[in-house]
């Protein structure tokens, strides 16, 4: 893909995101319009394409659940998740401050989380995902968001995050693993908090706090 086509793809993707979200939220409480946010994200992404930049994977969602594979620290191209033909993105406020975050992912690749802080685009995280597209949920009650990743057919990991003052904080990782049915028809479920086996009651306390009232945010795709 030549440089001109890459720039065109970035502009089309961001304009599509703006047109998708504007009917819902046209003006932000913080005083930044979505068109201004789109401009800042576009400029930053075009810079990263014109001057390719390597960044380290900040977290591997597989390893957070104690599963095999950990690419944390591996260097990857920053621009790739948002300019591939397989790119999917989310454009919405995940912190409750009225400023939209920008998430981009390639299935089986990395998930990039961007925000705008003090009128500058910041890379909050570069997450290694699994072969299955992760789901993103937002909880308006406490302004947290959750990235749910299917590690295997029997293991799901829910990583809870919060954005404050231009920084990303991971509050908890809730994982549940479904075991094999025994001869009596019982299917065991093991529950983990931050990679450690915990009781059902403790797991449910965290789940109720962060996940009970969350709503899914749909990905938009470059192929749509």
Each language-model region and where it sits:
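Acidic, small-residue rich beta-repeat scaffolds with periodic aromatic anchors
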Residues: 19-24, 29-60, 144-224
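Short, surface-exposed coil-to-beta transition loops
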Residues: 99, 107-111, 129-133, 152-158
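Calcium-binding motifs, dominated by EF-hand helix-loop-helix domains
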Residues: 90-94
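Sec-dependent N-terminal signal peptides of Gram-positive bacterial secreted proteins and lipoproteins
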Residues: 3-27
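Repeated scaffold domains used in trafficking and secretory/extracellular systems
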Residues: 131-138, 180-183
